[in-house]
């Protein structure tokens, strides 16, 4: 297979989600010696263009419970998995209605620890997400769990559930998206790669739910990232805990 064919193969396999940088790294991982500018030129000649970022669900409803201190304070640095997590809710709009995605992201590995997709942004959704995420690990004591000041995270159930595990709660300042930029970046990437321009492809909640499950599995186990030394999140976690 020549280089142009291999570039097209990588681009097609990842459904147009990879741009120049990731395709270049994938070729390097496949033992190719090639300059990223050459990859860029070939992609341009082939008319291959990686998807690029756009919106957001706002869950802030004022002070309805207890607001935690901003312990993260934009310090997203970590030395190993299970030191810092973040969460948020994002909205997806379709001709047939809306869906809401609530994931937990590990700040060290960028792995989606757990997630819940729902047609309603309610406390039951948060409960399901927490049960799946918190139930995966024997000990989470000392972990800092960050979020915005959404009503869900001020709720007594949420605060008590993480406190019981020894988790320390942290919240962004009101209306400051940069305080949770890791999650903002994740949502932008996800929507760009499997939602924007494809809204009409998902004809029902069930179809979108299946596509989301497929994407999260792909994201965790196959999608390489610069932050994780060009490994998928799960592989990077395993390498970090050896």
Residue ranges and their predicted role:
Residues 7, 23, 39, 43, ...:
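Mobile genetic element proteins and their domesticated derivatives, centered on retroelements
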Residues 116-138:
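Active-site beta-loop-alpha junctions of metal-dependent nucleic acid enzymes
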């Amino acid at each position: 297979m020549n280089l142009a064919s291999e570039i097209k193969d990588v681009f097609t396999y990842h459904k147009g989600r990879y741009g120049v940088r990731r395709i270049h790294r994938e070729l390097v991982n496949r033992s190719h010696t090639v300059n990223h500018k050459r990859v860029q030129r070939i992609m341009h000649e082939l008319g291959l263009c990686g998807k690029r970022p756009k919106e957001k669900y706002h869950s802030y409803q004022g002070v309805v419970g207890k607001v935690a201190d901003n312990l993260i304070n934009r310090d997203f640095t970590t030395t190993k998995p299970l030191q810092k997590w973040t969460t948020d809710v994002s909205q997806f709009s379709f001709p047939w209605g809306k869906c809401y995605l609530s994931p937990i992201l590990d700040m060290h590995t960028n792995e989606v620890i757990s997630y819940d997709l729902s047609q309603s942004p309610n406390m039951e959704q948060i409960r399901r997400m927490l049960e799946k995420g918190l139930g995966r690990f024997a000990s989470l004591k000392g972990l800092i769990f960050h979020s915005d000041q959404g009503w869900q995270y001020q709720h007594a159930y949420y605060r008590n559930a993480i406190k019981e595990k020894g988790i320390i709660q942290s919240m962004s300042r009101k209306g400051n998206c940069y305080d949770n930029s890791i999650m903002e970046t994740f949502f932008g990437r996800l929507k760009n790669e499997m939602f924007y321009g494809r809204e009409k492809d998902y004809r029902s909640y069930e179809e979108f739910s299946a596509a989301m499950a497929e994407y999260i599995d792909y994201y965790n186990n196959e999608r390489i990232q610069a932050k994780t030394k060009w490994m998928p999140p799960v592989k990077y976690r395993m390498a970090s805990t050896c």
